[in-house]
Regions:
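Soluble FAD-dependent oxygen oxidases
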Residues: 1-288
Length: 288
């Protein structure tokens, strides 16, 4: 038998923005304002996606309730819109607030049936089924609060990224020791994902490695500011500098001890997995 626990599906209010920048200075100022208000957006009850590509900056955010249960949600976002509208070289091409009956309707309209979507087209804008090098950086709340300008510069240096405002709130209240993986989630606000693909039919191994190195170099630009190696293990980076701390933080020594005790011969081993530092990159030969 199976027991299901069900929950009500409350309505949600979604906010969509498309901003376009015509100058590098305007683009940088937009990022500075976004970084500055980032913690306030989360504290006011909004979460979601803020992809950007080339000259365009998008928001696809969602708050619980219709109207939002947090009375600051709408006003906080409007304050950001009003601020960036005054920046020379920045134009707001789309600004929409729309209620949905629940998360499922919002998801179906914007991720499944793209003809109903608003703003960034996730069906087209996010590629799948192609080889790609991926990186993830979990950006702590402290970076948004104390390294505002440096973080904005690092973000603006990326032409294309898919960040997710999914931290804070209840996420930050969970004991980081409650699970083995990703303790950095408890102090982060946004997870920025960077990806770059290659031609599967023509790329040489050297060219593939160059793509992987480029993605790591881009991610390092963010990590240099955050001083935090935290990364999302489901968006694993092939050349990540310190996978032990990135994925498991201070849990790693204990996890490695467990692994060595349970599997002393490394029968089960994967690249960048626990206790894999004693193997070569192809997990073919032991190096320690």
């Amino acid at each position: 038998s199976v027991t299901y626990r069900t929950h009500p599906a409350p309505p949600v209010t979604a906010a969509f923005l498309v901003a376009n920048t015509s100058t590098e200075e305007g683009r940088l100022q937009l990022f500075k304002e976004w970084v500055k208000i980032h913690p306030d957006i989360m504290d006011a009850g909004s979460a979601g996606f803020w992809p950007y590509s080339g000259t365009q900056f998008f928001l696809t955010l969602m708050a619980m309730g219709n109207p939002p249960t947090n009375p600051k949600a709408t006003a906080t976002l409007q304050g950001f819109y009003d601020k960036i509208a005054t920046i020379p070289g920045v134009s707001i091409d789309l600004e929409v607030t729309k209620p949905y009956t629940g998360f499922q309707q919002w998801y179906d309209d914007n991720f499944i049936h793209s003809q109903n979507g608003i703003g960034f087209n996730y069906t087209i804008g996010d590629f799948s089924g192609v080889p790609a090098a991926v990186s993830s950086v979990l950006i702590p709340r402290t970076s948004f609060k104390t390294n505002t300008d440096d973080l904005a510069v690092a973000l603006a240096e990326l032409t294309d990224a898919r960040p997710f405002l999914v931290g804070g709130g209840v996420v930050s209240k969970v004991d980081p020791d409650a699970m083995a993986v990703n303790p950095a989630f408890r102090s982060m606000l946004s997870d920025i994902t960077i990806a770059l693909s290659w031609n599967v039919t023509t790329a040489t191994p050297q060219e593939v490695h160059a793509v992987e190195q480029t993605v790591t170099d881009w991610a390092n630009g963010i990590r240099d500011v955050t001083k935090s190696p935290g990364a999302y293990v489901n968006e694993a980076e092939i050349l990540i500098p310190n996978f032990q701390e990135a994925y498991w933080g201070n849990h790693y020594p204990r996890l490695r001890a467990f692994k060595q005790s349970i599997d002393p011969n490394d029968l089960l081993i994967v690249r960048q997995g626990v206790n894999s530092e004693g193997w070569d990159d192809e997990i073919m030969c032991k190096t320690l």
